[in-house]
């Protein structure tokens, strides 16, 4: 089990959620139950899945939740592009979010790679012991 609050990726994802909520407050009220709700839920999903995965008992399970978090980041980016296309976001704001999301995606991929490597090494060690 990992201490998720100490993970830099979780901390950065939490910053993203705060920034997303601040920006979506300015969206039209007609979007409250539509795009705003979808964007906010998607943003919340990113650190939530990191935390849930960190609380699991194995690297393999953690990787599965990181993959869900990773997919949510692409979904969020798509929703933000839609928001820009319908003039709810400026290009500058979209670019700032895109940079934040890209950083999270890189961190997520790196963490998944480390966990997979660790998991694979443990499996190999067990096989070596059995032989």
Please tell me what each predicted stretch does:
Residues 1-131:
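Short, C-terminally biased terminal segments at protein or domain edges
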């Amino acid at each position: 089990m990992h201490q998720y609050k100490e993970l830099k990726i979780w901390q950065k994802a939490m910053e993203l959620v705060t920034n997303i909520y601040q920006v979506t407050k300015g969206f039209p009220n007609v979007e409250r139950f539509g795009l705003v709700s979808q964007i906010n839920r998607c943003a919340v999903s990113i650190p939530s899945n990191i935390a849930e995965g960190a609380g699991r008992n194995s690297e393999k399970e953690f990787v599965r939740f990181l993959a869900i978090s990773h997919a949510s980041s692409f979904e969020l980016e798509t929703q933000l592009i839609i928001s820009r296309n319908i003039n709810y976001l400026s290009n500058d704001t979209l670019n700032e979010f895109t940079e934040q999301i890209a950083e999270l995606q890189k961190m997520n991929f790196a963490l998944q790679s480390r966990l997979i490597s660790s998991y694979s090494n443990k499996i190999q060690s067990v096989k070596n012991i059995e032989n």
